[in-house]
């Protein structure tokens, strides 16, 4: 489908940064902390006072330590292609200062910052209940449409508080919020990989995942595939990343990061059985798809801010960096057991150490799944048919390796030691 976005009437209040360098961190309408900020760079310089330690973002100490890192991770990373040019065009020094123009509002949680001396309210600003314009999102994804000079560019957008290297923006379609992601490089495969992951979860009967669809976006006069996924937070719930759970925790030398995360999550209200089942399923399905980028900000928990506890696992999302999208030569055979990843382990196969059950990954349900993935790659990307077939073959091989693993083979070792 082709993405067409109706221009929404944006929230009318936009922050001007020439009034004060003192800001209040807000959680909806609660005053959480007072901060001094560098309004040019958008960076938090120091915390003046913490009023409600229990309302601080997860991962921050009661005295506010960690707020600076939390704020930085909320912004568009410097590593995102084209962000320097966007900032220059908008006369912003950093992506943090761009975020400051939008009060730090997000569609992941209910935090924002209020300039001291201004009387503002959550109900009037938040992007859950208030529409927002699309022009800044267009710039961030290189998908600008013809606009009148008089239209201007509103910086008040949730698109400025979405991290990750892939270009993305929030859009409104039929009253619902969707995250659109695009990368014209690598055959635009990342967008299609998200849909393939959804087909995998569907076959396995797994319910807790974000459903992606493939759309089309115009960039420099050409059409490219993009992915569209609905928002999974709400005015009642927030997303807390796994990284936030362990950010302020010193992991003992005799405890793995995997176990430390589970322990910390349980201490914050999560159900241990649910967490373990989710993580094992995630490791197994990421293995099938060779998802190399399941770092601690790419999965997490749903947080209930009223009860101050984790209420469950956030749905699985962000499987775009998989299926050898950025490999020139696709590996096969034993080389598939030596894949470097950015996750609990440095090597993909080593993560199977943590898996104690099949976690609902019934391999017999995946008959013809490789062919389904191949068909999607052929339909939506411009890769050759040969590469699509070769990519699908890695799925077949990974399923065969998991079958051996379920039979008790220690496939992370050299084959002679299985």
Locate each region found by the language model.
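Glycine-rich phosphate-binding P-loop
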Residues: 291-292
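Canonical protein kinase catalytic loop motif
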Residues: 295-300
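Phosphate/dinucleotide-binding and metal-coordinating scaffold of catalytic cores
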Residues: 1-284, 288, 301-418
């Amino acid at each position: 489908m082709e993405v067409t976005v109706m221009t929404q009437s944006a929230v009318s209040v936009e922050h001007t940064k020439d009034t004060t360098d003192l800001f209040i961190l807000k959680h909806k309408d609660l005053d959480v902390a007072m901060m001094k900020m560098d309004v040019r760079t958008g960076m938090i310089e120091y915390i003046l006072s913490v009023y409600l330690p229990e309302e601080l973002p997860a991962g921050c100490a009661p005295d506010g330590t960690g707020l600076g890192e939390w704020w930085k991770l909320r912004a568009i990373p410097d590593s995102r292609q084209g962000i320097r040019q966007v900032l220059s065009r908008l006369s912003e020094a950093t992506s943090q200062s761009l975020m400051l123009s939008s009060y730090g509002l997000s569609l992941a949680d209910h935090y924002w910052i209020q300039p001291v001396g201004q009387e503002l309210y959550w109900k009037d600003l938040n992007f859950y209940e208030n529409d927002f314009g699309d022009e800044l999102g267009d710039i961030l994804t290189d998908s600008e449409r013809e606009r009148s000079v008089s239209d201007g560019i509103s910086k008040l957008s949730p698109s400025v508080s979405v991290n990750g290297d892939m270009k993305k923006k929030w859009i409104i379609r039929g009253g619902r919020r969707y995250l659109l992601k695009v990368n014209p490089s690598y055959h635009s495969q990342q967008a299609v990989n998200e849909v393939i992951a959804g087909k995998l979860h569907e076959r396995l009967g797994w319910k807790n995942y974000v459903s992606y669809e493939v759309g089309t976006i115009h960039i420099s006069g050409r059409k490219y595939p993009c992915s569209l996924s609905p928002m999974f937070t709400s005015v009642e719930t927030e997303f807390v990343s796994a990284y936030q759970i362990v950010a302020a925790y010193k992991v003992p030398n005799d405890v793995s990061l995997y176990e430390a995360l589970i322990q910390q999550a349980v201490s914050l209200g999560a159900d241990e059985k649910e967490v373990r089942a989710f993580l094992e399923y995630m490791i197994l399905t990421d293995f099938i798809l060779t998802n190399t980028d399941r770092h601690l900000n790419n999965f997490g928990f749903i947080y209930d801010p009223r009860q101050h506890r984790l209420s469950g696992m956030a749905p699985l999302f962000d499987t775009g960096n998989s299926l050898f999208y950025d490999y020139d030569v696709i590996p096969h055979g034993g080389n598939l057991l030596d894949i470097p990843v950015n996750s609990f382990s440095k090597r993909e196969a080593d993560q199977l150490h943590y898996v104690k059950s099949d976690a609902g990954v019934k391999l017999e349900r995946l008959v013809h799944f490789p062919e389904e993935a191949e068909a999607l790659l052929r339909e939506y990307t411009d890769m050759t048919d040969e590469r699509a077939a070769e990519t699908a073959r890695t799925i077949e091989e990974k399923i065969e390796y998991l079958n051996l693993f379920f039979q008790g083979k220690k496939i992370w070792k050299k084959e002679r030691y299985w």
